Amino acid sequence: MNIVKIGGNVIDDAEKLAGFLYRFSRLPGKKILVHGGGKIATRVAGELGIESRMTEGRRITDAPMRDVVTMVYGGLVNKRMVAGLQSLGCNAIGLTGADGAAILSHKRPVKTIDYGYVGDVEKVNVPFITLLLQNGLSPVFAPLTFDAGGDILNTNADTQASEIARALSRGEAVNLVYCFEKKGVLKDAADDDSVISRLTPETYEQYKSEGIIYDGMIPKLDNAFAAIRAGVRKVIICDADDLAEAVEGSAGTTIEI
């Protein structure tokens, strides 16, 4: 089974997104797509007169912004992808974590920063997701979950994909693929061909200490290594254009322990 997470920069590029959806639709066997939000929520919020607040690159999800991301991520972005996949013969079904109680979370506790209505995953409903897959459906998850009190929570898509992969890996072999706009983890951010083909915990720590791996790539890789340690067979980070090749092992960065 392949669980594929697609980033916001791909979602914001209509041509790149169309190409990705075609390649995803052609993956053999069971597959799940988890998508980020892109910049559409910021645009829609602006049109509605709602302020978008960010800190350290992360969105602050207050009550008005939660309404926006629910509409945009769970509605517009998700359903556009589902419609695109259906047109390609992929029997996709669009979901949030609230649908079928697929992903239960709790509201992130306030430490130094109050991120608002942001969720940390507690439980993945494996029987429900397995039922969909067994009936030939490909779930497409928006980055939204819910808590026991019925609140919708904005949820990091990288973490959501990792948690789904970890939960499903207890029953079968799972590949987790993070697709974004680069060819993989790069030694030189200015050189798209400087892909690190294999990354171990030792080389990861080395590259972090040398400043080669930094900023937003660190939480992505932390999620990747956590998934491998929890039983996911393979984690790959790649360009959305190289999805098929990455799954076959000939493109992107493969995470190993």
Q: Which residues does each predicted region cover?
A:
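C-terminal catalytic "cap/lid" subdomain
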Residues: 1-257
